[in-house]
Amino acid sequence: MSFPDEETDLLSEAKHCIRNVIHRTHRKFLENRLIGNFDSEDFSDAWKKKFAHAPTWCDADMSLQQIKRGKAVGNTVALTARAFFQLWLFRIGCFVQRWAWSTIFISLFLYCLCLGGLRHVTIETDLVKLWVSEGGRLNEEMGYLGQVKFERESGHLVHKVKRAVEQTTEPPAPAVKAEVRRGPELPKENGLGGGFQVVIQTPSFDGQNILSKEALQQHTKLMEEISTYEVKMFNETWTLSDICFKPPGPSFNSGPLAGIMSKLLDKIIPCIWITPIDCYWDGAKPLGPNPPLNLGPEVASFVSSLPPGNVTWKNLNPTSVIKEVGTLFDLGPIGNFFERAGIDGAYLDRPCIDPLEEECPKSAPNYFDRCHALTKFNEWNMAKAMSEQVTLERKIIPKDDGKSDIAETILNDIFGKKRRKRQADTTTKKPATKKDEDYYEYEDDADYLAGIANSTIAKKNPEKEAKDLLCLEYGSSLLKWMQENPERLGEFLTKEEMPDYPNYGDVMTGGCKGFGKKIMEWPEDLIIGGIQRDNGKLVSAEALQSVFLVSGAYDVFARIKNDKTDSHPGLDRHHFQPWMAGEIISTWQRNFTKRLYSHELNRERRQFHPLASTSIADMLEEFSQFNYIIIVIGYILMVIYAAFTQGRFQGWWLAVQSNVALAICGVILVTISSICGLGFATHLGINFNAATTQVVPFLSLGLGIDDMFLLLHNYDEIINICNKNEIGVLLKETGMSVMLTSINNILAFISGYVLPIPALRSFCSQTAILLAFNLIFLMFIFPAMIGIDLRRQRKGKRDLAYCSRGNPQMATSQSVPSNVSNMSSRAELAGYEKQADEYKRHEPWYTVGGFLNKIYIPALKNNVVKACVLIGTTTAVVFGLYGMYTSTLGLELADVLPEHTPPAAFLRAREQYFSFYPMFAVLRGDKLDIPNQQQLIEEYRAQLGSSKFMIKAEGKLQPYWMSMLRVWLQSLDMALEKDLAAGKFDLTNGNPIKVNGEKPSPESMIAARLVCSFGTNYNCDGRLGKMKMVENEVINPEGFYNYLTGWFNVDNMMYYVSQASFYPTPPGWEYNEKLAKVVPAAEPLLYSQMPFYQNDLIDTPAIVKMIEEIRATCEEYSERGLSNHPSGIAFTFWEQYLTLRWNLFQAICIIALAVFCVISILMFNPWAATLIMCIVVITTIELGGFMGLMGIKMNPISAVTLICAVGIGVEFTAHVELAFLTALGTIDQRLESCLQHMFVPVYHGAISTFLGVVMLVFSEFDFVVTYFFYTMTLLVALGVFNGLCVLPVILTLVGPKPELTPTDGSSVLPPPPPLRQQYAEKSGGVEGGMRKRKEKRPAEVEMSARDSPSTSSASHSSDDESSPAHK
């Protein structure tokens, strides 16, 4: 009995059948859904011949059929994937061919929906927003203060105070009239204007020494002109004095002259100028005030130190005035302030640029005595004959007009109140005691003035008066004559009497000082450029730089809103808003730059280079607009080239086979596609910038047209070898290459997003979006247009002459339903028999095709040529590596502006002459404990100052807020110690005590109030006389924030000068003798800054080295608990260079990996992807090296070009590689096949890319020409050489094997027989197998089924033989 064996055999056969069913079901799904089952019966003999040489290129599905039939072996996984892509590309092509017009209209309608975004286009012109890295520490640091303000004001920030603060039951005394104070908006320097308005003066001719009388006078005159520039807005006239940054006047004690002095100082406190003319008395000229103050003789009569007539900084000695007024009235600690600030005689003790200047004061070191000179001149002149005598012009001396308006106001303020007080006082009693406020005891004002006059006026000397009058009348005329005739001065003056012109180099060595000599020190490198020295002294210079500061909008608003002098009567103060102040500032700045651009000294050669915060933004906005003329010219050139390459002539007009109309429409629709892409990008919130408007239109056109030429090239061939579903076949064969290059280009620009520069991210994003839109156009709209053109050609109509017929030489096209499937071939194409003849082009040797076939391909097959190519490539790579090694970092700020514009000229002058940059060290955060970290802060500042890039004035760093606070407190400690020794204070409560009728000094009274204040407590017992506010150079931590409040309010001018920029600002407070209350403690500081000046930052490597050094120090002290960061233009615009190389390496790795993965997925051949990557890497190295050798510096813009080179390089290699991979035959045959297939479209694509790029040469921006035109042109040249020359040579040596190899070893593979024949073969094979199975034993049947490949293959596909007829 054999039943167990039979059961086992049956069970095994059942399992085998189940496996076969599952396998067949799986294969059926793949073939039905993923593979097209294309039928060779549908194609012409010419197409079959093409298939025989490149089967997998033409039809991967038919290649799989041959593998199944055992006619070939190959990578079935790759071919299955290829067949899937080709099936869907074929279906897309068939669909757009059938519904061509509908596809075009619907696609264009959807595209046009994106145009709505163009209504909201924003061109970003803020260079800081364009350049500062997004998401990095720099971005966080720049936004820190704004974020802290927002959090604090919205209540989200809970500040952890490190010292115990107890809530007092009794609120402190109201400070300054219960006013909520806001800190000043200190000007921010970003190197591009900001609050710092800059003027650079350069020589009028080459070799001029600008340290000369004439040049310095020109600079002085310009400063005076700037101070008078005005604009009219809001019914008022505004000048620089209305908007400039000026410190507030110092505080005065309450008294009869306190308010008056405050008003006077508010009018006379000047704008802060940083200028080289501050070395001279002439520096006072632009300070004003304008118009001058005329206090009249009444005021001058009792303040003899005031100059008679008009009062300006040219004749004002503020220290003398304060001292004299201080003997009459109690002015508080103002004298102490003047001494610490070093105001002294202001400008009156400085030399005059020209001692013959009429207004040069007598106190000037080189004052010229015109009266003595006039006497000598008259003696000399009178000795001459009448005909030779010099006639001087007499000056009319005006009579005094009496009291001025301001004098009347002052006198009324002083005396009016007293008169009213006396009139109201009706008592006959004599006051028992005289109060301190009663400084006079005259019956009326005239008696008071007469008393002062009698005590100061001496007896008159008639002879001296006559001499002085003569000098007044003719002195000015004499000085003018002497200036015009310097060669004749020796005729009446001795050598000792000659005018004493200063040695300008000696005077300006070491820099200059403002009106506050101790607090306003302008380093030499800030104000003088192109310096030459001799023994440390300046001997010549080539440039002068002046800076004046403009306040923030809110400060100007507050100043005007609270102005009690009613200086702008036409302004509606009730409706005045901060934005209006901002408009005034920006309008004045634009007027300032406009006036200097057109200055008379800038006509022949630009000497004055201005820059305001609006300058660069305005210039970028103007030149960032689309240049439609250049764009139109560029697109016309592209149309002409496309039409030229696609034109075919027959007789007098274009032939039927010509594609000029397609080329023109393609260029136009690529343009429309790009415009719609920009609209879509705007919908996504991507702003435009100069790179967008100047580069993207041309770059997207050049890259978008490449694949259009590939489609047109294959279209010429397809219509001559196919008569059915031509567009489907076109996309099936060409669509893979189009997708391969387009996707890699898109990925390349997406990878550029790794660079954190906003402008470059916008550029890369917009370009990627435009390329994606172009890809959709190439896959849908353009094939539909080709389908329409195909109908023309089938009808025999000439190109661009549809009423004229030509010789079509082709059969009429037929089409299949759009739902072509794997089952459609035989039934739907039954009856189709007509085949097209094989098509060959006529290509003379001078055409691209003729050169290729007759010269180029034979040359590449020569081993000597191959060796030369490889040696040349190796050499280029070596030079490339050397060039990359020697390349330097850098992008000059002037390069990002149009070359011929004034802002660019300013930046070039600055780069040439001034390597000076300001910076701030910022202390920040709620974890700071400044009172107890004073020593750490000093160490931090000292270590920063030890950098070789830091400027030290006379070996010392720039003073900062804590050092100024410490000096102020030390001066108060000294005053308090002196008055305590004199017994002028009650030690228990701090109240002042008169000793011999004298009260304590104002400084000591403020000091006593501060010593008794600590936190929220006020207690003098045990503190007065026993402790100081500053001990061993350390401020007492217990009362630190109380002292800070006192300094901020009493010494507020010093606060402004310190540029501390406190946040939160201390509360308001003023000294009140009658209210002994605590000085309110300031809140712990969340933000403060200390200024530094840096020099020798001549280029990007030096700046990067400085940043690394400063950053290292900042990070060290942050780790030690002192949260801080640096700030300034150098950090703003060069910070990204610290990570540029890493970001570039990262981006190139990302795009390289992406390209490798895309090629590997689409080709399913890692070795082919590796070879492409090798060529792309070679191209990138060569490009980077040549950029270095050409002097193109490495920066974020050139980094984008290198990143994109990886993706764009695929454009020139992927086509050739794919054609080589799909070709059959020997190495040389495959080389010839791939070049014949791809050389012409790649060449035309390169030319079209170059035509798109070449229009960049007309850009106004240097960086566009340098970093896009030069590099992109070089990239195209390298890409063509490496793609069409180096890659083919490498492929002949180490190229991948063909995807398919005929089993018979031949170099051709004919297409498979028609599907109906294959079905018949399979059916016959199955029936024969079944008959044999019945004759065999079960074991033999099982063995036969497993061992026979052909039988197995036939049986596996037996279920697939359900032909449409069966169904």
From Swiss-Prot:
Disruption phenotype: Embryonic lethal with embryos displaying a fluid-filled appearance and dying at hatching. RNAi-mediated knockdown results in high levels of embryonic and larval lethality. Dead and dying mutants do not respond to touch, display extensive vacuolation, molting defects which include unshed cuticles and in particular male specific molting defects that prevent unfurling of the mature tail rays. Surviving mutants are shorter in length and display defective egg-laying and abnormal vulval morphogenesis. SUPFAM superfamilies: Multidrug efflux transporter AcrB transmembrane domain (SSF82866). GO terms for cellular component: adherens junction; apical plasma membrane; cytoplasmic vesicle; plasma membrane. Glycans are attached at residues 235, 310, 454, 591. InterPro entries: HMGCR/SNAP/NPC1-like_SSD, SSD. Residues 1302-1367 are annotated as: Disordered. Residues 119-625, 681-694, 759-767, 885-1143, 1193-1199, 1259-1273 are extracellular. The keyword Glycoprotein applies. In males, expressed in the precursor and mature sensory rays, the cloaca, and pre-anal ganglia and cephalic neurons. Also expressed in five cells in the valve region between the seminal vesicle and vas deferens of the somatic gonad. Keywords: Cell junction, Cell membrane, Glycoprotein, Membrane, Transmembrane, Transmembrane helix. One of its GO terms (molecular function) is smoothened binding. One of its GO terms (biological process) is molting cycle, collagen and cuticulin-based cuticle. It is a multi-pass membrane protein. Residues 1346-1356 have a biased composition (Low complexity). Residues 627-788 form the SSD domain. Residues 1-97, 647-659, 716-737, 789-863, 1165-1171, 1221-1237, 1295-1367 are cytoplasmic. It is found in: Apical cell membrane; Cell junction, Adherens junction. The chain crosses the membrane at residues 98-118, 626-646, 660-680, 695-715, 738-758, 768-788, 864-884, 1144-1164, 1172-1192, 1200-1220, 1238-1258, 1274-1294. Its main location: membrane. Belongs to the patched family. Regulates osmosis during embryonic development. Required for larval development and in particular is involved in larval molting. This is Protein patched homolog 3.
